From Swiss-Prot:
GO terms for molecular function: neutral L-amino acid:sodium symporter activity. The lineage of its organism: Bacteria, Pseudomonadati, Pseudomonadota, Betaproteobacteria, Neisseriales. Keywords: Amino-acid transport, Cell inner membrane, Cell membrane, Membrane, Symport, Transmembrane, Transmembrane helix, Transport. InterPro entries: Na-dicarboxylate_symporter (IPR001991), Na:dicarbo_symporter_sf (IPR036458), Ser_Thr_transp_SstT (IPR023025). Disulfide bonds: none annotated. It catalyses: L-serine(in) + Na(+)(in) = L-serine(out) + Na(+)(out); L-threonine(in) + Na(+)(in) = L-threonine(out) + Na(+)(out). Coiled coil: none annotated. This is Serine/threonine transporter SstT. It holds the Pfam family SDF. The chain crosses the membrane at residues 14-34, 43-63, 82-102, 141-161, 192-212, 220-240, 298-318, 339-359, 363-383. It comes from Laribacter hongkongensis (strain HLHK9). One of its GO terms (cellular component) is plasma membrane.
Amino acid sequence: MQLLPFLLYRLRHGSIVLQIMFGLVAGMALALLSPEAAKSVAFLGTLFVKALKGVAPVLVFVLVATSIAGKTKGVQTNMRPVLVLYLVGTFLAALVGVVASFLSPVRLVLANAATGSVPPGGIGEVLHTLLFQVVDNPVNALATGNFIGILAWAAALGVALHHSSDTTKAMLYDLSQSISNVVKVIIRFAPIGVFGLVADAIATTGFSALMGYSHLLAVLLGSMLFIALVVNPLIVFLAIRRNPYPLVWTCLRESGVTAFFTRSSAANIPVNMNLCRKLGLHEDTYSVSIPLGATINMAGAAITISVLSLAAVHTLGVEVDLPTALLLSLVASVAACGASGVAGGSLLLIPLACSLFGISNDVAMQMVAVGFIIGVIQDSAETALNSSTDVLFTAAACIANGDVDVPAGELVKTDA
């Protein structure tokens, strides 16, 4: 009689990483032992994807509106160098994800993929579609999953509410927190969803689907490593004109490793602030830049959005020209800024990027489901890159402007 409450308790409070790994292994085992039984549990994966599909439009709308409405005045003036580094780094990350996807195209096995989209004819048609999606009725945009329209109306509402009373902003913030809590509940069922998705995928298509996931994971992790070890050090070098790698290694070791296991930029904020203190950075700078970075500095999320979106594109055989690819980089970097503070946030914004190519919401949400299957590693690596870069760029901006209290060790003053 006590078994069900115990299982529900473990599902709610246990390690989500271990649970997803267990669901992955259990799904593979069931598909190998009894393919028919594996197909019968496919509804668990379908139910999980439908839940995500239902909550994603509301989540994006509320979070973007709340973020813009509650934006603190004067942050741009005090934080301009850090903000520039954050935005440049996020855009370059999206661009690297796009380039990597073209160098090593990922093609997956998706249900109804052949009929799931209407490919655009080029950048002109993409912009034409984009324009009409922007002016869509907001209720219709929410009902149909038109993420471009949702983003536009949320931004407009956020700007309109920016000068509203603190009570209104507090209510909007409480609403966003409530929606985020609903998402967290849905995410807790990810292990069950992954179990159903993997069992059905292997029973239906064999191990070819998982091999496709391994290729996808290799492209994602390769792009993130390239950003962490090549692009970010180059950005820091251009800012401080000295060897960036002592600082890079310190940020990866003391911030990235912790973030990898917590899988939360918000949870890693105290770790980052302590590291900034050890580096001798001014508290009035990092006390603002670190929480801000946890919100908008999303290099890992930009890579995830661009790579998984182009995986859907290549799976469907959609031709993408250079201007459209650049537009995707921009959209992915902007969308990534809205992925903070939400479990699986970057995955839930994939439909926004997929809509540029006329890919249906059903197919886009299948890509989201694939993201959850590989999320045990992908989300951890993404968070590690996001969070460690917060400290890295804050330190780079402070060092470049001489905004350092004391030289902490040799990290701040090491020359090339």
